[in-house]
């Protein structure tokens, strides 16, 4: 082969999987492989799959099928690869199937099918690695796996128990990213607030001090690097209360992504989730008293087996009181291997849809009410996209792709990644509108 070997890559699923894809691509680029924009222009295709829900598995199978049709040489990795039988049955011609985080196995499969053109040269890639996100923000994965055993979830089966990175390893990566121009670090894992439990909060050397592998300590150190720090996938352990002070001080963004999943004590017990939602409401109230700018994002499941009309009504009432700023909702799907499949009294599909519609309608009103309070205020906005007359950005209350946006007019040209102060002039159900202040 006279040219460098070319790889096409499809990455599906959550931000954790996206980080896995970035690591694989970084290693391949260091070995001289080039990235092709289309499958039919590549020598081989890698598909990083999602296997959490049946709908995600179908999307993964469709992506594998497209790669097989357009190229024919396909390596499959990711969460669905942890249970390869369905892939093998549908596409027996794939070259290799591996589970999540098996970077070396993916590289070995690539080497067997498409040897590198030359010896590795690490200077082919920037020191912070290859990123699949825009230049101004990056996902920072601090651990793998999860020690919780929620009945609807098979992530521990796919990704194993919690394995945290040493604090100095995380901080070195974060510092490289900020040095390369990243303005926002999105801290992710399966269970961000459990960070360091497996390490027994061991210290590691960083700069002129020792830093514990602990949620609060890591958040504090990340906040000293000069970028926005956004905490996502936070399980509501009691020690989460401690990080609110960092938000009040401006060390990290006043934003918490906590997947509460439900509010009814009976449903939460069936899910094996924290069930004292009356105490959670009291905590939310304290958090907002301490940090009035705090934005809360959460996800909820409707139609969980055994969920009654009373359980769902309890959830709606709880949402009215909690006033979650940003909300995602899923209709329950039975997942192969999940213990929730054995719970009695499954909810009919039409009832799931009715409850989904009702919850999202309720949340739309809550969101509109909370956003309306921001009209007339000044907010810091990070610019994601620049158009001819209007730029699209996000406030500190908005994570990329999953939350709302802020649409801005400006008398001067704006740049992607720039952080500006804007006056908020109008709000709708999910988004804000305004203009860059001072011009």
Swiss-Prot record:
**What is one Gene Ontology biological process annotated in the Swiss-Prot or TrEMBL record?**
tRNA modification
Boundaries of each MTTase N-terminal domain copy? 5-115
Limits of the TRAM domain: 372-438
- Name the principal localization, coarsely classed: cytoplasm
Query: What are its cofactors?
Result: [4Fe-4S] cluster
Q: Name one GO molecular function term.
A: metal ion binding
Pfam family, any one: TRAM_2
Q: What general EC class does the enzyme of this chain belong to?
A: transferase
EC numbers on record: 2.8.4.4
Task: List the catalytic activities from the record.
Answer: L-aspartate(89)-[ribosomal protein uS12]-hydrogen + (sulfur carrier)-SH + AH2 + 2 S-adenosyl-L-methionine = 3-methylsulfanyl-L-aspartate(89)-[ribosomal protein uS12]-hydrogen + (sulfur carrier)-H + 5'-deoxyadenosine + L-methionine + A + S-adenosyl-L-homocysteine + 2 H(+)
Q: Which GO terms describe its cellular component?
A: cytosol
What is the free-text note on the cofactor?
A: Binds 2 [4Fe-4S] clusters. One cluster is coordinated with 3 cysteines and an exchangeable S-adenosyl-L-methionine.
Does the record's keyword annotation contain Iron-sulfur?
A: yes
Q: Which PROSITE patterns match?
A: MTTASE_N, MTTASE_RADICAL, RADICAL_SAM, TRAM
What region holds the Radical SAM core domain?
132-369
| SMART domains the record matches | Elp3
Q: Write out the residues that bind [4Fe-4S] cluster 2.
A: 146, 150, 153
Residues holding [4Fe-4S] cluster 1: 14, 50, 79
| Keywords linked to the UniProt accession | 4Fe-4S, Cytoplasm, Iron, Iron-sulfur, Metal-binding, S-adenosyl-L-methionine, Transferase
Q: Which family is annotated?
A: Belongs to the methylthiotransferase family. RimO subfamily.
**Function of the protein:** Catalyzes the methylthiolation of an aspartic acid residue of ribosomal protein uS12.
Instruction: Output this protein's name.
Output: Ribosomal protein uS12 methylthiotransferase RimO
Q: Identify the species of origin.
A: Bradyrhizobium diazoefficiens (strain JCM 10833 / BCRC 13528 / IAM 13628 / NBRC 14792 / USDA 110)
């Amino acid at each position: 082969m006279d040219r460098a070997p070319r790889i096409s890559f499809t990455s599906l699923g959550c931000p954790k999987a996206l980080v896995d894809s970035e690591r694989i691509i970084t290693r391949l680029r260091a070995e001289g492989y080039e990235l092709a924009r289309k499958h039919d222009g590549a020598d081989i295709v890698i598909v990083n799959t999602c296997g959490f829900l049946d709908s995600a598995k179908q999307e993964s199978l469709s992506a594998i099928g497209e790669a097989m049709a357009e190229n024919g040489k396909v390596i499959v990795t990711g969460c669905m690869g942890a249970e390869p039988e369905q892939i093998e049955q549908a596409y027996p011609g794939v070259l290799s199937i591996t589970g999540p985080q098996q970077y070396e196995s993916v590289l070995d499969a690539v080497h067997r099918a498409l040897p590198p053109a030359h010896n590795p040269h690490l200077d082919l890639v920037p020191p912070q690695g290859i990123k699949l996100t825009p230049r101004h923000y990056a996902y920072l994965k601090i651990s793998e796996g999860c020690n919780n055993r929620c009945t609807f979830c098979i992530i521990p089966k796919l990704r194993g128990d919690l394995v945290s990175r040493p604090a100095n390893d995380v901080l070195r990566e974060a510092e490289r990213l900020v040095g390369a121009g990243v303005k926002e670090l999105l801290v992710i894992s399966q269970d961000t607030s459990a960070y360091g439990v497996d390490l027994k909060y061991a210290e590691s050397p960083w700069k002129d001090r020792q830093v514990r592998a602990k949620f609060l300590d890591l958040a504090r150190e990340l906040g000293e690097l000069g970028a926005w720090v956004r905490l996502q996938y936070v399980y509501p352990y009691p020690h989460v209360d401690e990080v609110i002070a960092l938000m009040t001080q401006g060390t990290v963004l006043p934003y918490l992504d906590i997947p509460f999943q439900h509010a009814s004590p009976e449903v939460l017990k069936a899910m094996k989730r924290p069930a004292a939602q009356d105490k959670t409401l009291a905590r939310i109230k304290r958090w907002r008293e301490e940090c009035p700018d705090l934005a809360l994002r959460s996800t909820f499941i409707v139609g969980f087996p055994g969920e009654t009309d009373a359980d769902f009504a309890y959830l709606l009432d709880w949402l009215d009181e909690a006033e979650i700023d940003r909300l995602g909702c899923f209709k329950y799907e039975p997942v192969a291997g999940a213990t929730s499949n054995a719970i009695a009294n499954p909810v009919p599909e039409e009832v799931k849809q009715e409850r989904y519609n009702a919850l999202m309608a309720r949340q739309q009103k809550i969101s509109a009410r909370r956003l309306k309070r921001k009209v007339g205020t000044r907010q810091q906005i990070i610019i994601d996209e620049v158009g001819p007359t209007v730029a699209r950005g996000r406030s500190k209350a908005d994570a990329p792709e999953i939350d709302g946006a802020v649409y801005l007019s400006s008398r001067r040209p704006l740049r992607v990644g720039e952080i500006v102060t804007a006056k908020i002039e109008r709000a709708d159900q999910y988004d804000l509108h305004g203009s860059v202040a001072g011009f």
